[in-house]
């Protein structure tokens, strides 16, 4: 039943309508003569408070508000992958054809083409007992993604018919299931409410790392598949480039990139770069396994909340098909600011720094939809969603509410430091402030796939970096020459760790991605230099002789050695370290 109310008050993106008795919380509505998209966020008697996902200028009291009878939902099916959407899943390319470079108000574009035909290959057979999550057939959506057409959750019964191999639109019936409540026809298109998490059987321990090819993240502060990581940092510290690197190189099957309230130029960079980047694993365009959701800072604030939920719902859809998904949200602070603005318009009691009291629970709702799970269905797959959220604290203040509430939920914290960025140390991850609570759980994977002593090597390097900060305090008081020569050797090693290992050039063809085995061998080589340097100092060799060794230059160039030549070159460098330190 369609309910029609009338606008009685307008306050920016918040509208109050009368005559809405019978409407439901979070129901989607059409506002005014231009049919703007909105969502009911509060109900009291006959009046409904609506947040509008489009610009409300020009709307007048007395205009009609129509309910749609359902919550804000996304369309899921073939055609999602490789698309560029706005915050409420309208395809930006179609909108540009309709209304030009700026999104016209009330524009309605189909999220997924209803006319395009897809080649469907059936997998299930008539007579099979099926339930939610079972695979009915397959569609080659892009060169990189084989989409599995699943039985929607909540449907269970006997398959009475299934389409033969051929071309179908997403609205054509491809199967019919006889359930206890009658026959259910199934299409390739599914709709799902964005605020409701898709079901799974159970969550698993996150014990497999998400390999990103970035040395600082992989070796020292790993995130596990199904984990949640936060990247807080002030302006200009490299949050966006760090997230773009993860989107390009992380070993996830699917990447969802949400630009939530960020500068238009940054999203433009992503939109222009990604379609021309090749996926390192398949050689296909990276866009073939990426969904971009662009919601720039000049778009209506209410849509920021929607874009985060839209992104995580699309991620869950591909997770249900057995894929590992990486979701980048840049930045959750802008979403929190949108919540603060709408909360203020609703005249709610403010919490810390004006943010609403429910800030923590909203952040938790989002991050807790990450996880490594057993998917629903007769044959359960292991799949994951890894969430990486950027946080933009004003002035780089990590004690502000969004950062602190995010830290309570995320187990990985990559703190970006403006002073490191000013020194052109990128990625500017502060190794003293950052941490990962997944190191213990993923240690077994590294021992099995890279080296048995990976943890020991990593911890040894971390201890040296922490010791450097203690020694630097003394150096600033009395200068480096006053230190014992063994400590001077330690400072030389930590300089190499910082400059030759932690620094990584995102724009260099070779250094942009560093495989785990190469990371381990680079670290092992630097620590071998440390061991041999200490031994030489113990024999009475002056520290100046060790600092001047030619092999140091070779160690500095290790990051630029191509992968196929690295093993042989690494052995040469290690032999040269031992030889030159013994002859120094």
Curated annotation (Swiss-Prot):
Any one of the GO BP annotations: proton motive force-driven plasma membrane ATP synthesis
Signal peptide feature range: none
Organism: Methanobrevibacter smithii (strain ATCC 35061 / DSM 861 / OCM 144 / PS)
A single cellular component GO annotation: plasma membrane
Role this protein plays: Component of the A-type ATP synthase that produces ATP from ADP in the presence of a proton gradient across the membrane. The A chain is the catalytic subunit.
UniProt-recorded name of the protein: A-type ATP synthase subunit A
Family under the similarity heading: Belongs to the ATPase alpha/beta chains family.
Origin organism lineage: Archaea, Methanobacteriati, Methanobacteriota, Methanomada group, Methanobacteria
Protein localization: Cell membrane
The keyword Nucleotide-binding appears for this protein: yes
PANTHER family assigned to the protein according to its UniProt record, in alphabetical order: H(+)-TRANSPORTING TWO-SECTOR ATPASE, V-TYPE PROTON ATPASE CATALYTIC SUBUNIT A
Catalytic activity: ATP + H2O + 4 H(+)(in) = ADP + phosphate + 5 H(+)(out)
Alphabetical UniProt keywords: ATP synthesis, ATP-binding, Cell membrane, Hydrogen ion transport, Ion transport, Membrane, Nucleotide-binding, Translocase, Transport
EC numbers on record: 7.1.2.2
Subunit structure: Has multiple subunits with at least A(3), B(3), C, D, E, F, H, I and proteolipid K(x).
NCBIfam families documented for this protein: ATP_syn_A_arch, PRK04192.1
GO molecular function: ATP binding; proton-transporting ATP synthase activity, rotational mechanism; proton-transporting ATPase activity, rotational mechanism
Protein encoded by which gene: atpA
InterPro entries: ATP-synt_VA_C, ATP-synth_a_Xtn, ATP_synth_asu-like_sf, ATP_synth_asu_arc, ATPase_a/bsu_AS, ATPase_F1/V1/A1_a/bsu_N, ATPase_F1/V1/A1_a/bsu_N_sf, ATPase_F1/V1/A1_a/bsu_nucl-bd
């Amino acid at each position: 039943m369609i309910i029609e109310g009338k606008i009685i008050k307008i306050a920016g993106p918040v509208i109050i309508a009368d005559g809405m008795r019978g409407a439901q919380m979070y129901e989607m509505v059409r506002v005014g003569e231009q049919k703007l998209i909105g969502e009911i966020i509060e109900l009291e008697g006959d009046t409904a408070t609506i947040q509008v996902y489009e610009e409300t200028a020009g709307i007048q009291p007395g205009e009609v508000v129509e309910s749609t009878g359902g919550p804000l939902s996304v369309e899921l099916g073939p055609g999602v992958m490789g698309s560029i959407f706005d915050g409420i899943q309208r395809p930006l390319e179609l909108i540009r054809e309709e209304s030009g470079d700026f999104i016209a108000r009330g524009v309605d574009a189909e999220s997924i083409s209803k006319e395009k035909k897809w080649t469907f290959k059936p997998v299930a057979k008539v007579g099979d007992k099926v339930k939610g999550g079972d695979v009915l057939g397959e569609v080659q959506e892009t060169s990189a993604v084989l989409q599995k057409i699943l039985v929607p959750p909540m449907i269970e019964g006997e398959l009475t018919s299934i389409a033969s191999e051929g071309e179908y639109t997403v609205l054509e019936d491809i199967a019919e299931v006889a359930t206890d409540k009658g026959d259910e026809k199934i299409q390739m298109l599914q709709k799902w409410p964005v605020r409701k998490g898709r079901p799974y059987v159970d969550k698993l321990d996150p014990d497999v790392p998400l390999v990103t090819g970035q040395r600082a993240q992989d070796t020292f502060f790993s995130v596990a598949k199904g984990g949640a990581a936060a990247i807080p940092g002030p302006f200009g510290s490299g949050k966006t480039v760090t997230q773009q690197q993860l989107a390009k190189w992380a070993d996830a099957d699917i990447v969802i990139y949400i630009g939530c309230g960020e500068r238009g130029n940054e999203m433009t960079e992503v939109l222009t770069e990604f379609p021309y980047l090749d996926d390192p694993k398949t050689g296909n365009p990276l866009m073939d396994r990426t969904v971009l959701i662009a919601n720039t800072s000049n778009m209506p604030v209410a849509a920021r909340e929607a874009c985060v939920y839209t992104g995580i719902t699309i991620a869950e859809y591909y997770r249900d098909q057995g894929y590992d998904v990486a979701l980048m949200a840049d930045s959750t602070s802008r979403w929190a600011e949108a919540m603060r603005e709408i909360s203020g318009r609703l005249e709610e009691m403010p919490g810390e720094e004006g943010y609403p009291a429910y800030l923590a629970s909203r952040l938790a709702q989002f991050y807790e939809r990450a996880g490594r799970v057993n998917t629903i269905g007769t044959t359960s797959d292991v799949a994951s969603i890894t969430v990486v959220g950027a946080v933009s604290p004003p002035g780089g203040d990590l004690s502000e509410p969004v950062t602190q509430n995010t830290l309570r939920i995320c187990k990985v914290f990559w703190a970006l430091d403006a002073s490191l960025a000013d020194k052109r140390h990128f990625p500017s991850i502060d190794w003293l402030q950052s941490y990962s609570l997944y190191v213990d759980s993923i240690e077994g994977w590294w021992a099995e796939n890279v080296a048995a002593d990976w943890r020991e090597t990593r911890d040894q390097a971390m201890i040296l970096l922490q010791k450097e900060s203690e020694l630097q305090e003394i150096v600033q008081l009395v200068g480096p020459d006053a230190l014992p020569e063994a400590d001077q050797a330690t400072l030389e090693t930590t300089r190499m760790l910082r400059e030759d290992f932690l620094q990584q050039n995102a724009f260099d063809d070779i250094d942009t991605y560093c495989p785990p085995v190469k990371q381990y061998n680079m670290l092992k080589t630097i620590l071998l230099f440390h061991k041999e340097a200490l031994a030489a100092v113990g024999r009475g060799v002056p520290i100046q002789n060790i600092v001047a060794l030619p092999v140091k230059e070779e160690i500095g160039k290790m990051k630029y050695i191509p992968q196929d030549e690295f093993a042989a070159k690494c052995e040469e460098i290690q032999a040269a370290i031992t030889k030159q330190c013994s002859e120094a």
